């Protein structure tokens, strides 16, 4: 487990970091699954997946279900009309 700081500046542990992903590029394949609920995230961690992708709206419950897996928050782009809307949504997801 790697020690990191969350976007809220709180200490946490993660199985992977961005640096790990960059270092493994071309050398290792990772597994990733979509999870949008506490139960799905918990199941993903217990099943041994490396990473989770989630709708940005569901990050809080997904993080409750999986405290340790690398999490990607995805924006649903058809919900944003302009580039400014996309940036606002991206910062809100952080």
Q: Language-model features: where?
A:
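N-terminal amphipathic alpha-helix/helix-capping segment at the start of soluble metabolic enzymes
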Residues: 1-33
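Active-site beta->alpha loop and helix N-cap motifs at the rims of alpha/beta catalytic domains
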Residues: 2-5, 11, 38-94
């Amino acid at each position: 487990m790697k020690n990191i700081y969350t976007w809220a500046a709180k200490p946490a542990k993660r199985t992977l970091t961005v640096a790990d992903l960059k270092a493994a590029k071309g050398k290792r394949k990772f597994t990733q699954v979509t999870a949008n609920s506490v139960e799905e995230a918990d199941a993903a961690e217990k099943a041994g997946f490396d990473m989770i992708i989630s709708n940005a709206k569901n990050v809080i419950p997904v993080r409750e279900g999986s405290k340790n897996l690398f999490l990607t928050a995805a924006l649903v782009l058809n919900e944003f009309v302009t580039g400014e809307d996309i940036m606002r949504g991206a910062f809100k997801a952080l």
